[in-house]
Amino acid sequence: MRVLVAGASGYIGRHVVAELVRRGHQVVVLLRRAPDANLASFLDGARPCLTPTLGDAALAASAGRIGSVDAVVSCIAASSGRPAEAWAVDHDMNQALLRLATRLGARHFQLLSALCVQRPVLAFQRAKHAFEQALADASIDHSIIRPTAFFKSLAGQIERIRHNKPFLLFGQGPGPACVPISETDLAGFMADVLADDRRWNRTLATGGPGPAVTPHERGEMLFALAGKPSRFRRIPLSLVRSVGCGLAGAGRVSRRAADGAEFARIAYFYATEPMLVADPKSGQPSAAATPRCGRDTLAEFYARTWRKGLDGQRLGDAALFERRS
């Protein structure tokens, strides 16, 4: 299969490219700039196609260099939760990629989305959901992949524990559970779906093979690795809400404040919402209803990262809790 991958420089996209190449597919990757040595190691065997942006004009100009393809895989995502960026990237750029897929004769369009889109209340979730709907309504075959939580998203407090700081928890109780998945397991799942037309034209959620874990349990795992007694510090959810409300008021006259209010809403969402598939009967998040795949566990990831550091994991919003010198 000849596959075009967008978002190949990202955390998941690079692993998707490596997995597709490993399986013998011909892979073309859209890049804004030539890859550095680290990225190039993941893209070995793929053919790069440089384009300054993923807008319609730039993609149309690149179509001749790309050539015909059997499938397009989109791993693009906004790098922040800013509403304007989310709609520009998660919606508009994906729409441009969908039009390019038709131009290139692709039979299939695979979208890397996110499980949180099952209840879209934030701007970036609504942008993703709007494109999911557009893709489902398009004439091309499709698959929409909704992973739970990435290991790297749960790595932000490792350095806090290493530097004798308490593990931060929001609100009371153990916190919302998730069934996280590694980048390699997710890449394998996406490649499996791409090769199996029985799984096309569906929205497929997946987590990793391990059990559902809460923030409190993740903290206990890290303190055990450190050989230290557990120490937790709780941040009141009322504080997050009040910050968001204050910024929302100021956001009527300030774009920066409006973005800050959205970040507060994002923090509140992830502090309270389990990343689990909703049970079809009750509608409530359910570990039992969450599909699983792969081999990598969070415990193994934490143990390896504790020994070797966060190589390749210091990405995006996971930096929220990272220690800065």
Where are the regions a protein language model picked out?
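N-terminal Rossmann NAD(P)H-binding glycine-rich loop of SDR-like oxidoreductase domains
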Residues: 3-25, 29
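Substrate-positioning beta->alpha
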Residues: 93, 173-194, 202, 214
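Glycine/proline-rich active-site loop of Rossmann-fold NAD(P)-dependent oxidoreductases
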Residues: 153-161, 193-204, 228-230
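A hydrophobic C-terminal alpha-helical subdomain
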Residues: 238-325
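NAD(P)H-binding glycine-rich loop region in Rossmannoid oxidoreductase-like domains
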Residues: 35-104, 116-118
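Substrate-binding strand-loop-helix patch
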Residues: 177-184, 206-224, 236-245, 296
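Non-catalytic, hydrophobic alpha-helical segments
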Residues: 12, 72, 186, 190, ...
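Glycine-/Pro-rich loop/turn segments that contact NAD(P) or position catalytic residues
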Residues: 78-164
